[in-house]
Structures are given as structure tokens and as C-alpha cells.
Amino acid sequence: MDILSEILTNAGWKADLLARTSLYKPWGFRFPCERSGGFHILSQGSCYGRIKGKLIHLEKGDILFVAKGLDHELVYSPNDKVVDIAKFRDMSEKQKRSEKLPLTTFVSVRYEVPDAIQHPFFLELPDYILVKSSDVLAHHPLNTTQVLISQELDSGIGSDLILQRLTDILLYYVIRHWLEIHPSSSPGWRNAFKDEKILSALEALHRKISYPWTLEKLSRAVGVSRASIANRFREVLGCTPMDYLAKLRMDKGKTLMAMENFTLEEIARTVGYSSAFAFSKAYKRIYGLSPRNSEQERLGA
């Protein structure tokens, strides 16, 4: 069980290819991100990202991930004028081919982030994550996934489903790379991934989400005392094991509801509740809305 992949899957982020283009200087794009985040992959040349006024130099093979809600820019040089990314097709079509001007090729992917309460792990992500190609081994999955994305796009018949899966894989490795090279001394999820007992407990809860867990059963599964596992959860994650389980079940239930293939009764049993009523009561306690009202809000009804 991979806890990070489970968290990302349950988050319900949906990828959308914004741009895949090659441009000659000068150029610049603005990326509005009120309800989205995303990343940029630089396949050729160099450019700059600008986030909250800070310039970030990007070179071939670099990946820049930007968190939800951060409007930002991508420019060839710091003084280039910018246009909204929605107009990138107009700009690319107007450019004339040149053998002299530097050429930059990049892929931009947007992730639409649901308005629902997200997993607390996402609150610990920085404004942006920069993955420098020079910091990644040649055969690292980050590089392999970039190649597969480029090949899928170059084929001209790229499947939306395949691109969605590949971008999800890339997002996973970008975040895992950040976790590996930026350890934290403060309490939080970044430490949970490195605490063997916490990780074992999380894996048990995720693997058997419908099991009638108690603190006693969880402590036996992990091989520590009830007091020890309870204290570790509070110190590292800021909640009790049972509070975490309740939120985990609701997140899973929310994901199943969005699929529209299950009745509320089926969802309740899948995530460990005896009835749709019990599930609905717990759901409203955590989200402040009943499952039905939550779905109506999601669909804009």
C-alpha cells in the first residue's frame, strides 16, 4: 500500500493539457489559477517562471509544479510581455520559423482541484516545487514519464486517458522527490512518511478501510501500545487514529459518490458504516453538508 498514491487518488484532481508548444523569443504567458494548480515541463531551451514576483530559471528537463490558487507566469526573459495562456494558440501561429532565434518547447498541465476539503497533506505543500534535471538520475521514473508523455503527444493520436494517467504518475514522482530532498523538523505529514510505526498504522487503515477498527486493534496490528500509537498520531499528524480513519472513510466515500456508480447504501458498506444513515451522519459532521447536498453543490445544481 502506497499512502501517497492513495492520498493523490482520493483528492479527485483532474488533469487538463493546457499547452504543448514550441516558441521563438520573445514570448510570455499568464496562468490564472484560482481553482487549479499544475506543472510545466521544459523539453527544450530555457525560460523563467514568475511566482509572487520571484523569478525561477528553468532549463531543459526541469519541472515546475505550482500549487492551487497561485497565478503565475512563464516567460522567455524577465522583461517579456505576457498574454493569458488561453491565447497561446494565437501567439504560436503568428510566429515565423527561424533558425537563429532560440527555441523553447514546453508542456503545461493544469489540475482542477475540487472545492471540497482536501487532505491535510496538501496544506503542507510549498507554493511551488522545482525539480532540476541535474538533481535527477538519468533512469529515474521522473525522466521516463516525461519521455512517455512526449511520445504520446508526438503520436498525434494521444489518448486522453493515457495522458491523464501519465500526468498523474509525474505528479506523484514530483511530490515524492520533494519529500525526499526536503525533510522537515516540524510535526506534519512530511514526517509521517518517515515514521515506521505511523506508516504501518496508516497502511493498515487504508488497506482495510471498512474493518471495525478500534485503538486496541490498531495497536496490535502495528505492534505498539495504545498510548504509543495515539501519542505518535497526535505528535506527527495532530489528530487521533480514529479521527483520521473517519476522515479517510469520508474521502473515499466522496470519491465513490463522484463516480455515480454506487448507491449510498453500497458506499456506506464499502467504507465501513452499517447503513446509509450512519454514513450520512458522519459525512455531515465532517463536511457540514449531507451527501445529497454535497453532490448537488458539486454538480452546480
Question: Whereabouts are the PLM-identified features?
Answer:
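Generic protein-terminus/edge-of-domain signal
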Residues: 1-65, 70-97
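A hydrophobic/aromatic-rich effector-binding and dimerization subdomain
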Residues: 3-10, 71-150, 180
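Regular secondary-structure segments
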Residues: 43, 145-153, 202, 206-209, ...
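Residue at a beta-strand N-cap/secondary-structure junction
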Residues: 48, 55, 212, 261-262
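A general structural signal marking secondary-structure boundaries and capping sites
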Residues: 68, 78, 113, 152-156, ...
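An amphipathic alpha-helical interaction segment
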Residues: 107-116, 124-189, 193-203, 228
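Basic/polar phosphate-binding segments, predominantly the helix-turn-helix DNA-binding elements
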Residues: 169, 173-179, 200, 204-251, ...
